[in-house]
Amino acid sequence: MTIADIKKTTEAKMDQSIAAFKNNLAKIRTGRANPQLLDTIHVEYYGSMVPLSQVANVALLDARTISVQPWEKNMGAKIEKAIRESDLGLNPASMGDLIRVPMPPMSEERRKEMTKLARSEGEGAKVAIRNLRRDANEGVKKLVKDKLASEDDQKRAEADVQKTTDKHIAEIDALVAAKEQEIMAI
């Protein structure tokens, strides 16, 4: 493995960490309705538990309401029950073959909890990025130790990896700040 390979794989892994972090952030509830909020809900479908998105169409009805359209009419009650029993604190209402999921307004205390959760997710993502930086630097040091790269190459590679790390951490900070803004907006 060369220094270029190490830098390339490190950047790719950091990008994957950012993508996973964005996915986790999307699941944190804000005052607005977000169809991704229901991604974690599983419904019993012919004896097995399947994600809600595999048995129904989940869409945004308006800023504070999510609509869930079951593909099979007999699934309505099961979907409604699964949403109600989730830890999201939602109260779905069935309207024929459409299930409306209104988003209750969040209290100030709940908003602060969600902000803390977003920050802790951000810290977790930063730790993952820093661990990738450490792994890359150790890989470069091993190349120098094995006489496959010079110490000058090591310094340049470590500086490049640090720049990549700084870029990704700045992106995480921006995402957390945007999420906090979204949570605190009434």
From Swiss-Prot:
It is found in: Cytoplasm. It comes from the Bacteria. Keywords: Cytoplasm, Protein biosynthesis. Gene3D superfamilies: 3.30.1360.40, Ribosome-recycling factor. GO terms for cellular component: cytosol. InterPro entries: Ribosome_recyc_fac, Ribosome_recyc_fac_dom, RRF_sf. Belongs to the RRF family. NCBIfam families: frr. PANTHER family: MITOCHONDRIAL RIBOSOME RECYCLING FACTOR PSEUDO 1, RIBOSOME RECYCLING FACTOR. This is Ribosome-recycling factor. The gene is frr.
